[in-house]
């Protein structure tokens, strides 16, 4: 008898599964006999419990297991016979109008959609490019110097000159202060501290607080009002105005290291050669620029593919991906040390839009890869592993690490497939190049 597949919508389908009751009962009896060989009950030796008692105790549970197994197998057989590409898990519901002597269930499910790929030649891509200039190397060196800054206390040589006993605090100085803040005459939680240190100009403190500290000399005090923003993280003071008193305890002036052989050695240049140091910095910046520009163009390619493709997205796959994203979010919270992160009440609904995009993109990419034979080749995977390993001290060990784990290798394979897709689309689409500075590139990718 042919199976009737009902069409309930664009992707939703339903089939009826019938199971002869005598066949189900036969399997139930067989499993209970097997169970009776090992079952334990008070007053009986193992395996000596009367079959009737085992049946009374376990028949309901065993029947449910048998029905689940048989319904699942029957659904699999029907799916294969009807060439159904089932998306996600089906739901089964018992029917009340089953033929006498049968169990009957409705299996409701979704199928994978037909993906209509658009003409890649109509896609428009803006490809970001960047060239590492000497000025960019200088800017990076300046950042590296600031990361290695040393602060000199009063009475030591510093940027402000030797001694500098009456020098006032200014931007870049590390200051140590005592402060007390009050709202309506009462000190609030977190509103006071002794020997509190921060660097002026880093933005760690609210602007009014930094402004009050700027210009003070050691031993001087100042009173000022500070209006907390409405969105301030401390809800008990958000939107309120506090009266602060601040006293300068210590001023330390920043001293940046000179760019010399010792500085180069601190960056891993063993012989301290400054030319080698600049070349190494340039190589690192070029690698980073390549990574960032590839990420930008990949996102543009994916957006373009979604724009030119037509398909319906199975809700079952969206819901599955939502659950994955919730699990990932909880794992992230756990890694950050958040208590009870595994049970955090994260609603799946907040990930629906993201999950729909991910599922849709996955279906489009699968169709594009299949249609244009863009699968990853072993030599491509090895080339990417080798390239990744170059940035490590022992590249051979990194290569072994990748090839010793199938999951890591599968992740690299997925990366290569994406790269193949990007290359394919760029070879067909309307591409315009846009030159940006490395600083602009870093800012753009940080905001993405």
From Swiss-Prot:
GO CC annotations, alphabetized: cytoplasm
EC number: 5.2.1.8
Domain called PPIase FKBP-type: residue spans: 172-257
UniProt signal peptide: none
Keyword Cytoplasm: yes
Localization in the cell: Cytoplasm
Catalytic activity: [protein]-peptidylproline (omega=180) = [protein]-peptidylproline (omega=0)
Molecular function via GO: peptidyl-prolyl cis-trans isomerase activity; protein folding chaperone; ribosome binding
Statement: the UniProt record of this protein carries the keyword Hydrolase: no
Any coiled-coil regions, as ranges: none
Major subcellular site: cytoplasm
Role: Involved in protein export. Acts as a chaperone by maintaining the newly synthesized protein in an open conformation. Functions as a peptidyl-prolyl cis-trans isomerase.
Protein name: Trigger factor
Species, as recorded: Paraburkholderia xenovorans (strain LB400)
């Amino acid at each position: 008898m042919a199976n009737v597949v009902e069409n309930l919508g664009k992707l939703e389908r339903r089939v009826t599964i019938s199971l002869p009751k005598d066949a189900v009962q036969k399997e139930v009896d067989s499993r209970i006999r097997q169970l009776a060989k090992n079952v334990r009950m008070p007053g009986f030796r193992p395996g000596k419990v009367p079959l009737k008692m085992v049946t009374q105790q376990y028949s309901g549970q065993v029947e449910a297991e048998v029905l689940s197994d048989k319904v699942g197998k029957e659904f699999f057989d029907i799916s294969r016979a009807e060439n159904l590409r089932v998306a996600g898990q089906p739901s089964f519901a018992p029917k009340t109008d089953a033929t006498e002597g049968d169990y009957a269930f409705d299996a409701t499910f979704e199928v994978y959609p037909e993906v209509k790929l658009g003409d890649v030649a109509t896609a428009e891509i803006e490809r970001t490019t960047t060239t590492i200039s000497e000025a960019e190397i200088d800017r990076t060196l300046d950042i590296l110097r600031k990361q290695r800054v040393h602060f000199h206390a009063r009475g030591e040589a510093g940027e402000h000159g030797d001694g500098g006993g009456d020098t006032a605090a200014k931007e870049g100085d590390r200051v140590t202060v005592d402060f007390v803040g009050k709202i309506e005459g009462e000190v609030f939680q977190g509103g006071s501290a002794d020997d509190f240190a921060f660097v002026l100009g880093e933005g760690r403190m609210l602007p009014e607080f930094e402004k009050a500290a700027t210009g003070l000399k050691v031993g001087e005090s100042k009173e000022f009002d500070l209006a907390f923003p409405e969105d301030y993280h401390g809800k008990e003071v958000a939107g309120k105005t506090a009266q602060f008193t601040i006293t300068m305890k210590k001023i330390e002036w920043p001293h940046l290291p000179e760019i010399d052989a010792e500085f180069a050695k601190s960056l891993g240049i063993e012989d301290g050669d400054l030319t080698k140091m600049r070349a190494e910095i340039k190589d690192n910046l070029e690698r980073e620029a390549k990574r960032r520009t590839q990420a930008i163009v990949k996102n543009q390619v994916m957006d373009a593919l979604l724009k030119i493709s037509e398909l319906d997205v199975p809700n079952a796959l969206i819901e599955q991906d939502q659950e994955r994203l919730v699990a990932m979010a909880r794992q992230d919270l756990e890694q950050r040390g958040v208590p009870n992160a595994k049970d955090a009440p994260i609603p799946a609904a907040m990930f629906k839009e993201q999950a729909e995009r991910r599922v849709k993109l996955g279906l489009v990419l699968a169709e594009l890869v299949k249609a244009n034979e863009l699968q990853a080749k072993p030599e491509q995977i090895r080339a990417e592993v080798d390239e990744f390993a170059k940035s490590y001290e022992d590249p051979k060990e990194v290569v072994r690490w990748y090839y010793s784990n199938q999951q890591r290798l599968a992740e690299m394979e997925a990366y290569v497939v994406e790269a193949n897709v990007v290359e394919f689309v760029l070879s067909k689409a309307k591409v315009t190049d846009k030159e940006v500075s490395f600083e602009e590139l870093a800012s753009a990718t940080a905001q993405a």
